[in-house]
Amino acid sequence: MYNHKVVEKKWQDYWAKHDTFKTGTDSNKKNYYALDMFPFPSGKGLHVGHPEGYTATDIVSRMKRAQGYNVLHPMGWDAFGLPTEQYALKTGEDPEVVTKNNIANFKRQLNKLGFSYDWDREVTTSDPNYYKWTQWVFEQMYKKGLAYEAEVPVNWSPDLGTVVANEEIVDGKTERGGYPVYRRNMRQWMLKMTAYADRLLEDLDDLDWPEPVKEMQRNWIGRSLGAQVTFKIKDSDKTFDIFTTRPDTLFGCSYTVLAPENKLVQEITTDAQRDEVNAYIKKIESKSDLERTDLNKDKTGVFTGAYAINPVNGKEVPIWISDYVLASYGTGAVMAVPAHDERDYAFATKFGLPINPVLEGGDITKEAFTEDGPHINSEFLNGLNIKDAKKKMVEWLEEHNCGEKKVNYKLRDWDFSRQRYWGEPIPVIHWEDGETTLVPEDQLPLRLPHATDIKPSGTPESPLANLTDWVNVVDENGRKGKRETNTMPNWAGSSWYYLRYVDPHNDKELADYDLLKKWLPVDLYIGGAEHAVRHLLYARFWHKVLYDLGVVPTKEPFQRLYNQGLILKNHEKMSKSKGNVVNPDDVIDEYGADSLRMYEMFMGPLDASIDWDDNGPASTKKFLDRVWRLFVNDLDLKAIPQERIVDENDGELDKVYAETVKKVTEDFDALHFNTAISQMMVFMNAAQKAKTIPREYAEGFVKLLAPVAPHMMEEIWQVFGHDESISYAEWSTYDPAKLVESTVEIMVQVNGKLRGKFQAAKDADRDEVQKQAMELPHVQKFLEGKDVKKVIVVPNKIVNIVAK
């Protein structure tokens, strides 16, 4: 009887001892790079949702090795970050020790699942030998003017003691811990991602990525063509610019809105309005950008008491502030045309502001008219459509020096500072004379110093500020300086890790260019869709910078991306707080890793979110036990192949075997694992009914199932008499001629009524088919005492006998 505990440990030990999955370097073979999004090693370990994507890449990796490719299939750890630091603060443990322990647990779990990783290429983002190169990339960006310091509005969480990203805020509180967040201006390191906006947008077209992910990135970059218009402030020499995609509606502008953080606000607010304006600014400081720009939220705002002059008609328009305008987007100011914009209409209606139509159509007493129509109330634009009116208005603005054609982006520069301990130190020194310099490259890595007190400082400095021996430096001329105390965000190390896997032990450069040329771009990258606009955009940005530096040979990092769905429990995402986590260790102990791998691939399409069924692994174990019994006789002390496995081929399984090899190969390539497994079940049913199973087909089937259930298939392969691992046994092939039926079913009619049917060789001779039809006992019964007048034979289909 098959014992999964014994067999799985045996083969995991064998693979480790023999370096079975060491990346091939045969220059005569093609290369294939299959990559998983590496995990953050949390204290909770893996749950059964994690192995879904990992199993998918593992199946493809195992197939590609068998197809004769050199395969790079690595794994590593995204080890810096806030959760480890929070845990360390709570328990008093060292974050480095916490990380090491968590990695050991994750690695144990991954190895129990039988994944074919090349562990010689393992990387950890918190390892100084790794983050030396993260710091090196930062330094190259600084030299190119892509890393800079700026005072920017940020989401500040005093409780976490750091800035948090917009995406990490829910209902004005931090996603992690539910702490309040406040808007404040802080000195931050920024990366100039906006310099790459056009390339990030255009190069999406060439990628084999899910369309929804590409669309999310397009929207995040948010390129829009329009005009920048300058408004003068009444009774003042001050001006402000607005960006609009609809310069043709400028005649309809009836008010303007500034972001509450806009520096102009305090300068132009009248004494009568100052208290109200300041109260409003205080009220909205805990809202994230995402909340503020939510289209469905109630519109709020306050009049500043000041007026601007509409440049096209000289009319005075009131200047308001509202939280839906962000200082960090565009110019931090907008013009409002309520007659033709839904948000402006709702705002104007609520606060009783004028609504001036400039397009013909609709009923603006009921709603904004947002479609096209001839321009009205617009002097030199009257009668024109939108396209022509836009062009003419931009020409007018440029001619009168109060505006110009402009491209705008939603994309912002990347806020690259965190006020925490557990992250990569930023390799910068601030000197007392105001100069800022980089740590010399030959002194990298700038190591994160060991610290016993990593509590947030509560100031814009990280806990590193407390380590005065590390912070304070003196150069050879006696000039004093301080090290940068902010650290990098946890997205830094994950922006380039796939490059380091190619050459993980290189201490002279990030990775050898010729090796990168052999392996890039990544052929298959599988991970969660939640990374669409953060990690995937950051990695593309870093890659393009490195391409411009001549460090990498390709414009894009990941050629093919696939997002696995979620595995839910009781229709909810698994989480410790909900108590609905299924631990893979328990499933493996009871049913085996092969059963778990197979169940996760058979649950449904890889990209679907599906509910976990506790009985699922039991059903795939039953199937695998059937496979074992079909091929292996283990009744005696030594397991041997079943007697039904023979060297001869009677042809009975030809067609189903050819269909199975074809479908499984195509489905594995297309990541349709559930339908591939269904086809293997079809073959199993046919093989169980067959009198004998040709050895060629038995071995071929085992090779097809090996990527899904590698431990059992290694064992069966050994029972079949092979000394080598199945991992490099040549992938199964089929004869296309055998996909076609060798026999056909012929219907026999007597005087138009069906009286019998029989099997005949395909394309058999007409006379032979007619003879077989006439000899059928049931047909002869209906021909007794009659003369056969005519016999019509339709090849491969029907014999029609006319008798009287």
UniProtKB/Swiss-Prot annotation:
Pfam families per the UniProt record, alphabetical: Anticodon_1, tRNA-synt_1, tRNA-synt_1_2, tRNA-synt_1g
Binding site for ATP: 576
Entry keyword Lyase: no
Entry's localization field: Cytoplasm
GO BP terms in the entry: leucyl-tRNA aminoacylation
Keyword Acyltransferase appears in the UniProt entry: no
Motif 'KMSKS' region per record, residues: 573-577
Superkingdom of source: Bacteria
A GO CC term assigned to this protein in UniProt: cytosol
GO molecular function, one term: aminoacyl-tRNA deacylase activity
CDD domains, per the entry: Anticodon_Ia_Leu_BEm (cd07958), LeuRS_core (cd00812)
Disulphide bridges: none
Motif 'HIGH' region: positions: 39-50
Enzyme Commission number(s) from the entry: 6.1.1.4
Catalytic activities: tRNA(Leu) + L-leucine + ATP = L-leucyl-tRNA(Leu) + AMP + diphosphate
Entry keywords, A to Z: Aminoacyl-tRNA synthetase, ATP-binding, Cytoplasm, Ligase, Nucleotide-binding, Protein biosynthesis
Transmembrane segments: none
Family: Belongs to the class-I aminoacyl-tRNA synthetase family.
Protein name from the UniProt record: Leucine--tRNA ligase
